[in-house]
Amino acid sequence: MGLKADNWIRKMALERKMIEPFCEANIGKGVVSYGLSSYGYDIRVGREFKIFTNVNSTVVDPKNFVEENVVDFEGDVCIVPANSFALARTIEYFKMPDDVLAICLGKSTYARCGIIVNVTPFEPGFEGHITIEISNTTPLPAKIYANEGIAQVLFLQGDEKCDTTYKDKKGKYQAQTGITLPRILK
C-alpha cells in the first residue's frame, strides 16, 4: 500500500473528479492553509456547523441520536464552547477510487490551540461530503474559520482491489451532503 503524491492527487482530481472543488495550489497566506500539498490534500471546512448543547438536558446516544443534542449555526467563524464539540462538513465532495483508502489528520495550527479534529477513513468507493468532528479540549471558547483548512487527507492505494467497496455494501453515509448525524441501520 503506497502513499500517493501531489501529481497523482492532481490527476485523479482533474480527470476523475475525486475532489470537487479542487484547489491545485496550497493557499496559506493569512488563512489556515488548504489545497494540494506534497503528499496530501488540505480540506476546508464549510459554513454550516452543528454545535453540541445541553440546553435540552438530553443524553448523547449513538444508537438513538436526537436533533435536540445540537444547535445549528451558519457563518464565517464558529465559536465552539469550552470543553465542547461540534460537527461540520467539508467544502470538498469526494469520489474515492475502488482501490484507495484515505486517512484524515487534523492540522497542527488547530491542534496547537487544543482543537482536535477527527474524521474516520474514506473507504474505497465512498462518495460524498465529509462530516468533520471538532473537539475543543480547552477551558476557553475556540474559533473555527469557515472556508479555510481544517485537516489533511492522505491517500493510500492498495496493492489490489478489495472484494467489496463502500458503495457495493451501500454504506449508510454514501453520497451524503451537508452534515450527517450518526445513523444506525435497522
Curated annotation (Swiss-Prot):
Name of the protein in question: dCTP deaminase
Organism: Campylobacter jejuni subsp. jejuni serotype O:6 (strain 81116 / NCTC 11828)
Described purpose of this protein according to its UniProt entry: Catalyzes the deamination of dCTP to dUTP.
Classification of source organism: Bacteria, Pseudomonadati, Campylobacterota, Epsilonproteobacteria, Campylobacterales
Quaternary assembly: Homotrimer.
Keyword Thylakoid: no
Pathway: Pyrimidine metabolism; dUMP biosynthesis; dUMP from dCTP (dUTP route): step 1/2
SUPFAM superfamilies according to UniProt: dUTPase-like
Gene3D superfamilies: 2.70.40.10
